[in-house]
Amino acid sequence: MKLLLDTHIWLWSLGEPARLARHLQRELQNDENELWLSPVSTWEALLLHAKGRIRLHGDLPKWVAQATAHFREAPLTHEIVIAAQQLPLSHPDPADRFLAATAQVLGLTLVTADERLLGLGKIATLANR
């Protein structure tokens, strides 16, 4: 499978793997799966750090390089931006819209714990349950 991790799943996989369901931990460790990450998640993590909601240790560019090293980088294209605007999400969070649209356009499975994204129906998802 080609798995696009949402921001929380990515951060939990790095620092709090116990928050991930066992089946999800297995999928993330399965070498047959491709793990993808959007730069939107990096942006969101840096915003959370700046607001004091999470702590990222050390030099931020170095942290980003290490935290993203094992992931394929999902592009943010005009096609994805248009798809994000057209998604029928119940809230205007741009990060969630971009992640869902990225999964939709690139044919990736979005790994998330967000019920709003899990209930979208227009994209393949893998739940953290």
Name what the model sees in each region.
Residues 74-75, 125-128:
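Short acidic-hydrophobic, aromatic-tinged amphipathic segments that line or gate anion-handling sites
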Residues 1-37, 51-64, 106, 115-116, ...:
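Short, well-structured N-terminal submotif of metal-dependent ribonuclease cores
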Residues 69, 120-122:
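Short, structured coil segments at secondary-structure junctions
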Residues 45:
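Phosphate/NTP-binding elements of NTP-utilizing enzymes
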Residues 57, 68-115:
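Active-site neighborhoods of divalent-metal-dependent phosphate/nucleic-acid chemistry enzymes
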